Regions:
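Conserved catalytic motifs of the protein kinase core domain
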Residues: 2-5, 86, 193
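Intrinsically disordered, glycine/charged-rich C-terminal tails and inter-domain linkers
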Residues: 128-219
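Catalytic NTP-binding/metal-coordinating core of nucleotidyl cyclase/transferase enzymes
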Residues: 1-69
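Catalytic beta-strand-to-alpha-helix segment of the class III nucleotidyl cyclase homology domain
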Residues: 58-165
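Residue-level signal for well-ordered alpha-helical positions
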Residues: 21-22, 73, 137, 209
């Protein structure tokens, strides 16, 4: 069956070297924290961890926008936590064949994997077509063509990152991303207090969290 999906591959840079130098136990702790972050972000963004790949993961989204945000959130969490190992990621979207119910065959999944391979530390590389699905607070920088192993023609790439907060930084109270207020989604909690969000889904979650609990009278 042919479907349209978006794919992200993310992994820990330098994990093999870190394991050789620091030992198995510290490496296991770093990997456990990485996987916990990926699980939590994927669950919150409505994307799915399709498989674990040792020190990496393959993430699949029905829509491209939530996948882009998920990858940038994972990178931001790793940066804020001063993780011992930085992450890198590659993204692509397009039609693929859903094979035996749980695997995907096609150019987009292969491209996303290769982009993760060529990305540097703290880089999120994407096929340029993903720019059409990015929220306003995401910047597509360094547009260029690159020869990718396994692909006949050069691929046009961009590096995705959050816009610098500028003079009016705001923090999404749900996911913790720091955004420029001019590009954030304005909203409010159920109590009417103003707030800013990275996405309508975070705005909806905040509204639910702040909704007053109505006591049910005893009968």
């Amino acid at each position: 069956m042919r479907v349209v999906r978006s794919f992200g591959f993310v992994d820990l840079c330098g994990f093999t070297h870190f394991t050789a130098i620091e030992g198995d136990d510290p490496a296991t702790r770093v990997l456990a924290e990485f996987r916990r972050t990926v699980r939590d972000v994927a669950s919150g963004r409505g994307v799915r961890v399709a498989k674990w790949l040792g020190d990496g993961a393959m993430i699949v989204g029905v829509q491209a926008g939530p996948l882009v945000v998920a990858m940038l959130e994972i990178e931001a969490i790793a940066e804020d936590a001063r993780s011992l190992l930085p992450i890198r990621a590659g993204l692509a979207t397009g039609p693929v064949i859903l094979f035996e119910g749980d695997d995907y065959i096609g150019t987009p999944v292969n491209l996303a994997a290769r982009l993760c391979d060529v990305a540097g530390p703290r880089q999120v590389l994407a096929a340029s077509g993903l720019c059409d699905y990015c929220p306003p607070w995401v910047m597509a920088r360094d547009r260029y063509e690159m020869a990718i192993p396994g692909f006949v023609d050069p691929v046009e790439l961009v590096r995705l990152s959050a816009r610098p907060p500028g003079d009016h930084p705001v923090t999404d109270p749900v996911c913790g991303l720091i955004l420029d207020a001019a590009f954030a989604v304005a909203g409010a909690g159920a109590d009417g207090a103003p707030a800013w969000f990275c996405s309508p889904s975070c705005a909806s979650t905040w509204s639910e969290r702040t909704r007053p609990v109505v006591a049910t009278p005893d009968r």
